[in-house]
C-alpha cells in the first residue's frame, strides 16, 4: 500500500457516498457505495477477503471520494460512475437499474407517473429513488388515491370511467375537472415530498381503523407504508437540477491559511464529475480569500469547458465580476434544493482540507516538532502535551474536551470529555471548570492520568488567567507549562500566548504551525461533536428534534451555523432557509412561535 493511499484511508469520511479505487496510472478499477465510507474502504484490506477482493486490493494505488447526503444519492451516483468508467472489477450494470422517478406529465390535463429515467420535459420530477428500498408502487397508488389526477383516456367524454367511480380520477370524462383543480392537486403532491404529514395522518387513521376491526395484517401494511413514506420524504433531497444544460456548484472552506475548493459538475440534471484543489494562502483576510477563489474560478474555466450556469456563495459584486469575465450566469443558491447540493459540495471541500492537513503533518518528524516547540518555549523537552476546548449549543449542554499527544502521537485512551455544569456562564468560566475537573482526575491514583508537560488552551489572555487561578487553588499540584493558541478575527489560528501573556508568532508555512493548527482543529471538532451528542441524548430538553422533519443531520447543520438553540429561535425564516429548505424553516418558526404564545 502506497504512503499516499494510507494517508487518504486515514481521513476517509465516515459519511454516505461513493469511492473510486484507482491503479498507479489513475485508471478507475472499481466504483463502490457505502453508508459509511470509512468502514467500507478499510474492509478491502482484511486478510480473510475472497480472492477477487485481494486481487483488487493488490492493484490499488489511490482512491477518490464523493461525499453525498444519503445512501439513495450514493446508489444513483454509483450507477452513473460505473457506466462512465466501466471499471474492470465492477459487474456490468443492467440498463434497468432499479432507480425510479415520480413525475407529473407536462400536459393540459396531467397525470402522475413512475419512470426509470429522468423526464426532463415534465412539469415536476422527484427522485431518483432506489426501488428496492422504498415501496414506490404502493406510494404511487396511495398518492393517486389521495390526490387524484386524470386517469382516463383524453378522448373519453360524458361517461364516467372506472377510476372516476372509485374516486381515483379528476373527472375529465365527466368534464368536472378544471385548471384550478389540477394546479391544487399538483401543489399537494409537491408539498408531500417536503411535508408528508397529511399522508402520514391518513395512514395512521387507516391503521387504527384496521386495528380496531382486528384486521391486523392490513394494519401492519399501513404501518409499513408509513415508514416507507417517512423514509422516502426524508431521503428526498432532490439532487436533480431541472434543466437540459450543464450546471456547476462550487463550494469552498478556508482554515488556518489553507483554502480547499470543490466543484460538482451536473449535466442534464445529474451529477457527472468532481474537481478539487487545495492550496496555502499567505493572507487570511476574507477579502484576500475571496480574491483567491475568484482567481481560481477564472483560471479553472480557461482550461475546462464552461457550464451554462455556476452556483457559488459569494457577494453580489464578486458574482458579477465572475459572470462578466466568463460571460455566463453566476449566482448564489436560489432555493432549498440548490442550498442542499452546495452544502454537500462544501462537505467534500472540508474532507479535502482534512486530507491535506494530514498530508502536511504526516511527513513531519513529530519528535523534532516537539523539540522545536520546547525551544520556542525555552524548556528542555516536551514529551507530552494536552490541548483543551469547550463547546456548547446552549448553556445547559456544555462539554469540555481534552486530547493528549505524546511525541506527536494522539493517545486516544487518555483523551477525556467532561460535562460542564456551572451557574457561571461564559467560555472563560467553562475553561476554568474544565481544568478544575482535569486536576481532580490527575490527583486520583485510580484515574492514572498524570499531567502532561504542556497544557494548550484554545484561547488568549482571559482563558490563561482563569486557568492559572485554578492551579493556584492546589498548593500540592505543580502546574504544567501553560500556553494559549489565539485565533484572529477570521477564527483562524494566529499566534501563541505564553503564561506571562507574551506573544510568540510562528511562520504560517512552518511544520510547527501546521501541527498546532491541526490539533487545535481536532480538539474543536471533538468538543463540538460531544456537545451535540449530549444535546441529542436529551431530546426532551431539545425541542428542535421534536419538530416533524427535523432529524439529527438537520439539527447539526443548524447548530453548526447558529451555535445556540436561542439563536435558532431568534433567526428569521430567510436566515434559516440559507441552510435548510424554506418549508422546514417556516415549520421551525411556527413551532417556536406557538411555544411563546
Curated annotation (Swiss-Prot):
GO terms for cellular component: cytoplasm; excinuclease repair complex. Signal peptide: none annotated. Keywords: Cytoplasm, DNA damage, DNA excision, DNA repair, Excision nuclease, SOS response. It is found in: Cytoplasm. Pfam families: GIY-YIG, HHH_2, UvrC_RNaseH, UvrC_RNaseH_dom. GO terms for molecular function: DNA binding; excinuclease ABC activity. InterPro entries: DisA/LigA_HHH, GIY-YIG_endonuc, GIY-YIG_endonuc_sf, GIY-YIG_UvrC_Cho, RuvA_2-like, UvrABC_protein_C, UvrC, UvrC_RNase_H_dom. It comes from the Bacteria. Residues 14-91 form the GIY-YIG domain. One of its GO terms (biological process) is SOS response. Its main location: cytoplasm. The UvrABC repair system catalyzes the recognition and processing of DNA lesions. UvrC both incises the 5' and 3' sides of the lesion. The N-terminal half is responsible for the 3' incision and the C-terminal half is responsible for the 5' incision. Interacts with UvrB in an incision complex. HAMAP family: UvrC. Belongs to the UvrC family. This is UvrABC system protein C. The lineage of its organism: Bacteria, Bacillati, Mycoplasmatota, Mycoplasmoidales, Mycoplasmoidaceae. The gene is uvrC.
Amino acid at each position: 500500500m502506497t504512503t499516499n493511499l494510507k494517508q487518504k484511508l486515514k481521513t476517509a469520511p465516515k459519511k454516505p457516498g461513493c469511492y473510486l479505487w484507482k491503479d498507479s496510472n489513475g485508471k478507475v478499477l472499481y466504483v463502490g457505495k457505502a453508508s459509511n465510507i470509512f468502514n467500507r474502504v478499510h474492509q478491502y484490506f482484511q486478510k480473510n477477503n475472497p480472492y477477487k477482493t485481494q486481487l483488487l486490493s493488490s492493484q490499488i494505488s489511490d482512491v477518490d471520494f464523493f461525499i453525498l447526503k444519503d445512501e439513495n444519492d450514493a446508489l444513483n451516483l454509483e450507477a452513473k460512475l460505473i457506466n462512465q468508467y466501466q471499471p474492470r472489477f465492477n459487474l456490468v450494470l443492467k440498463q434497468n437499474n432499479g432507480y425510479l422517478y415520480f413525475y407529473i406529465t407536462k400536459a393540459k390535463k396531467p397525470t402522475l407517473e413512475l419512470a426509470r429515467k429522468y423526464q426532463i420535459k415534465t412539469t415536476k420530477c422527484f427522485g431518483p429513488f432506489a426501488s428496492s428500498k422504498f415501496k414506490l408502487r404502493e406510494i404511487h397508488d396511495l398518492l393517486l388515491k389521495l390526490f387524484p389526477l386524470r386517469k382516463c383516456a383524453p378522448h373519453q367524454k360524458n361517461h364516467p370511467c372506472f377510476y372516476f367511480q372509485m374516486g381515483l380520477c379528476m373527472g375529465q370524462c365527466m368534464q368536472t375537472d378544471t385548471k384550478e383543480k389540477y394546479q391544487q392537486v399538483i401543489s399537494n403532491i409537491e408539498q408531500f415530498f417536503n411535508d408528508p404529514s397529511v399522508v402520514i395522518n391518513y395512514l395512521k387513521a387507516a391503521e387504527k381503523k384496521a386495528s380496531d376491526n382486528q384486521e391486523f395484517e392490513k394494519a401492519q401494511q399501513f404501518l409499513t407504508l408509513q415508514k416507507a413514506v417517512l423514509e422516502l420524504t426524508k431521503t428526498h433531497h432532490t439532487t436533480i437540477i431541472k434543466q437540459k444544460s450543464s450546471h456547476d456548484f462550487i463550494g469552498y472552506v478556508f482554515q488556518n491559511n489553507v483554502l480547499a475548493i470543490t466543484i460538482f459538475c451536473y449535466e442534464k440534471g445529474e451529477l457527472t464529475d468532481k474537481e478539487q484543489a487545495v492550496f496555502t494562502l499567505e493572507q487570511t483576510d476574507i477579502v484576500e480569500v475571496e480574491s483567491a477563489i475568484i482567481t481560481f474560478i477564472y483560471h479553472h474555466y480557461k482550461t475546462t469547458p464552461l457550464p451554462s450556469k455556476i452556483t457559488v456563495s459569494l457577494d453580489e459584486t464578486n458574482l458579477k465580476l465572475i459572470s462578466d469575465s466568463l460571460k455566463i450566469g453566476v449566482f448564489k443558491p436560489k432555493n432549498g434544493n440548490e442550498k442542499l447540493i452546495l452544502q454537500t459540495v462544501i462537505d467534500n471541500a472540508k474532507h479535502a482540507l482534512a486530507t491535506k492537513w494530514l498530508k502536511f503533518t504526516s511527513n513531519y518528524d513529530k519528535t523534532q516538532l516537539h523539540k522545536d516547540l520546547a525551544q520556542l518555549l525555552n524548556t528542555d523537552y516536551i514529551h507530552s502535551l494536552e490541548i483543551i476546548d469547550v463547546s456548547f449549543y446552549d448553556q445547559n449542554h456544555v462539554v469540555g474536551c481534552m486530547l493528549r499527544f505524546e511525541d506527536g502521537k494522539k493517545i486516544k485512551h487518555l483523551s477525556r470529555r467532561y460535562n460542564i455544569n456551572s451557574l457561571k456562564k461564559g467560555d472563560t468560566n467553562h475553561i476554568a471548570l474544565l481544568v478544575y475537573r482535569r486536576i481532580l482526575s490527575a490527583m486520583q491514583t485510580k484515574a492514572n492520568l498524570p499531567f502532561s508537560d504542556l497544557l494548550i488552551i484554545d484561547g488568549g489572555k482571559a482563558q490563561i488567567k482563569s486557568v492559572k487561578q485554578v492551579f493556584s487553588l492546589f498548593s500540592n499540584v505543580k502546574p504544567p507549562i501553560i500556553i494559549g493558541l489565539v485565533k484572529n478575527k477570521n477564527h483562524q489560528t494566529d499566534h501563541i500566548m505564553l503564561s506571562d501573556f507574551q506573544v510568540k508568532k510562528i511562520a504560517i508555512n512552518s511544520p510547527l504551525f501546521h501541527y498546532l493548527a491541526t490539533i487545535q482543529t481536532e480538539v474543536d471538532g471533538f468538543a463540538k461533536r460531544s456537545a451535540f451528542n449530549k444535546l441529542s441524548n436529551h431530546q426532551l430538553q431539545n425541542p428542535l428534534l421534536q419538530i416533524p422533519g427535523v432529524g439529527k443531520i438537520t439539527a447539526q447543520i443548524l447548530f453548526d451555523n447558529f451555535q445556540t438553540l436561542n439563536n435558532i429561535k431568534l433567526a428569521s425564516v430567510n436566515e434559516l432557509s440559507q441552510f435548510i429548505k424554506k418549508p422546514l424553516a417556516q415549520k421551525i418558526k411556527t413551532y417556536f412561535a406557538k411555544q411563546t404564545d
